[in-house]
Amino acid sequence: MITLGIETSCDETSVSILEDSNKILSNIVSSQVEIHKTFGGVVPEVASRIHVEVLNRLMDLALKEADKDFKDIDLISVTYGPGLIGALWVGITAAKALSLALKKPLVGVNHLEGHIFANFLRDDPPSFPFIALIVSGGHTEYILVEDVGKYRILGQTLDDAAGEAFDKVARILGLNYPGGPEIDRISKTGKSIFSFPKIRCDRELDISFSGIKTAVLYLVRDLKKENKEIPVADIAASFQERVVEELLERAMIALEKFNIKTLVVSGGVASNSYLQKRFKEESQKKGIKLYIPPPYLCTDNGAMIACAGYHLYQKGYKSDLSLEAKPDLLLGER
């Protein structure tokens, strides 16, 4: 079965051709990072316009690289939320047009579902049930995944997503956008010598990054007042360690609470080198089977959407031409 996956939820345009459940024939991604860097963040109207400009070309490139034609496509899969509403509509409109013209089935995919299924693009995918941690620029959630389409949110961020916190702290430290890779890079030259507050929430699997972010802000402000040098690498390393340890602690609590031995981590922040190191160390120590996609599948991409769409379709899920963009779509909502 050949699935065409389309991802346009934020600032990456991506089209992928997938054979059966996990064979990536092509996965073309056009990133807008350099464009939005000048604004210090994603500008929704600009993102939508660029999706319109590049999507058709990416489809042609994806088909060419896969050595396929439109007539070879069996299923069309597209992100329909959550995300930027204008950006989502670009992908949905293209997917519906293809479905109508080719007379092929259409499946709308939750973007977060796509991140989970990025871990299924391998020969030994995780077995249900498992705990999933999605850590990205827009989301931080702990999820009990019981089956395809069956999700239970156990905990989530009460304010900024992890990736958003990285971006904001990077800005405080004078680093470039996007902040996640910058903090990861510069932390390698620093030492975790600053103690930032532990996160406390009413629910044990919820998380909040506002306290850590504020602590960084006050630390930098006080150092400037005293005309002291800002040890950017050390602050970055200390911040990164605190965030990762908090994420890890809650993941282990969730696994123990539900007596599950499989942990799936995905989203852009999952490519952070310190996060990967600590999660691997702790998983090995506790006999947990850990899944983290390769970096190119951690960030937004069409392959994960194609994969999720394939599995949903096999379970009987499908959409029709009334499919609409849902910028605030919740995981498990249809």
UniProtKB/Swiss-Prot annotation:
Query: What does the entry list as the binding residues for substrate?
Result: I134, V135, S136, G137, G138, D167, G180, D184, N272
User: Entry cofactor note text?
Assistant: Binds 1 Fe(2+) ion per subunit.
Question: Which compartments is it annotated to reside in?
Answer: Cytoplasm
What are its E.C. numbers?
2.3.1.234
Catalyses: L-threonylcarbamoyladenylate + adenosine(37) in tRNA = N(6)-L-threonylcarbamoyladenosine(37) in tRNA + AMP + H(+)
Q: Show the SUPFAM superfamilies listed in the entry.
A: Actin-like ATPase domain
> Where, by residue number, does Fe cation bind?
H111, H115, D300
The broad enzyme category this protein falls into is: transferase
Q: Which Gene Ontology molecular-function terms are recorded?
A: iron ion binding; N(6)-L-threonylcarbamoyladenine synthase activity
Q: Which Pfam families match?
A: TsaD
Could you list the residue ranges that cross the membrane?
Answer: none
Q: Which UniProt keywords apply?
A: Acyltransferase, Cytoplasm, Iron, Metal-binding, Transferase, tRNA processing
Cofactors (names) = Fe(2+)
Q: Which GO terms describe its biological process?
A: tRNA threonylcarbamoyladenosine modification
The principal localisation class reads: cytoplasm
- In terms of domain of life, where is this protein from? Bacteria
Cellular component (GO) terms are: cytoplasm
Can you tell me which family this protein belongs to? Belongs to the KAE1 / TsaD family.
Function (record text): Required for the formation of a threonylcarbamoyl group on adenosine at position 37 (t(6)A37) in tRNAs that read codons beginning with adenine. Is involved in the transfer of the threonylcarbamoyl moiety of threonylcarbamoyl-AMP (TC-AMP) to the N6 group of A37, together with TsaE and TsaB. TsaD likely plays a direct catalytic role in this reaction.
- Provide the protein name: tRNA N6-adenosine threonylcarbamoyltransferase
